[in-house]
Amino acid sequence: CGYPPLQMTNIGANNLSNIISMGFDVEVFTPAPQSSAQLSLASFRQFGNVSKTAEIALYSAVPRIAIEKKIPLILWGENDAIQVGDSEAAGKNYFDANNLRNLNTLTEGGIEWIFNEIGIHKAQSYVYPDKRSFDKAKLDIMFLGPAWDDWSLDENSIYGALTGLTLRPDDIDITGD
């Protein structure tokens, strides 16, 4: 899931091109620009968070696409229960990511307001698949973090930079990470 076109940076576009040049199949899903702008404003007014709907779309897109394309396994990066302390996302073990649907990002405030803001049809991209859809598709999500002894934001940034990722030049005080 990417940012809406007006929020995409040259660094982000170059990093995406780099991943493709490494031989990865890449499928890009981006929210519609006008709907995204409308939802960002509504999200800011209601939650004080301009990025809430972008995060909802990010978390929801991956399993929706996997179910649609009959991909049985998603390898997810960070374990939100460990990395950011969202215990509702904790699974049966450190690798189990099947409780992402319980993340505060996806549950806090619901999504009815999104339907009201842009309509049911346009809001489907913001709906995280329910457990029944997961079970029917036999979809499993696993966190990658526990497979690496040195999983951290710093180590991941170093590894990414050494393998072709272009990092943002701004200071952490500006970017937040």
Model-assigned labels for residue ranges:
Residues 2-177:
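Nucleotide-activated chemistry modules centered on ATP-dependent adenylation/adenylyltransferase
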